């Protein structure tokens, strides 16, 4: 599964991808949230895409731009999303583009 936008493709990370992300994470503030995402995605295999991180990659280069996550299943039809970008990709509209695509996808789900 992937979502494609004008400049990005978004892929929900499988458990191995989450483990790789955790191993590469140097920001101590992200280790626990990423660990929680991995644990919750494993605990909810039928709805794992709502609990895992989604990698954000540039369409043209395939470079990692950042990630976003849903904070579990939407409550009352309203998804909650968190996101982070590498500093060199901030202030260029990537987060807006990714969040729009993720919300569009979320609202299409039953």
Where are these regions (language model features)?
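Glycine-rich acyl-CoA binding loop
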Residues: 93-96
């Amino acid at each position: 599964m992937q979502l494609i936008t004008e400049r990005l493709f978004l892929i929900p990370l499988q458990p191995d991808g989450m483990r790789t992300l955790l191993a590469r994470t140097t920001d101590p503030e992200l280790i626990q949230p990423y660990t929680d995402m991995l644990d919750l995605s494993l605990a909810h295999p039928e709805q794992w895409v709502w609990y895992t991180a989604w990698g954000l990659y540039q369409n043209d280069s395939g470079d990692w731009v950042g990630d976003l996550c849903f904070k579990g299943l939407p409550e009352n039809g309203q998804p909650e999303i968190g996101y982070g970008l590498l500093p060199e990709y901030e202030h260029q509209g990537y987060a807006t583009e990714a969040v729009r695509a993720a919300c569009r996808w979320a609202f299409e789900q039953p």
